[in-house]
Amino acid sequence: MVYGAKRNPDRCPTHPGALLREDVIPATGKTKAEIAQLLGISRQHLYDILRERKPVSPAVAVRLGKLFGDGAGVWVRMQAAYDTWHAEREEDVSGIPTLHPKAAYERPET
């Protein structure tokens, strides 16, 4: 991984299911059903993640992190980036003002 590289903000981040489907699971030599069993989740749940129909929940991220040895944070951050990118394009925030950052974080004097 290249640190400090800027990604194109117009490109949707990869759904963790796509990474699992295209790279991670094939590299194990195991079937999707075997991976689901090892994770302790249903095949349907795993298939929904792989088809990008369901997000990787924190609970599943913990299981993935243990199984693949990379920790839950990788999967949680990947899902958060994907979800945030979509939310920023779907949510209408035009009626919400932007406060000066200092004012937003200062406590009022008492």
Stretches found by the model and what they are:
Residues 29-48:
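Short alpha-helical DNA-recognition segment
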Residues 53-66:
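Short, basic-rich loop-to-helix N-cap that marks the start of a DNA-contacting helix
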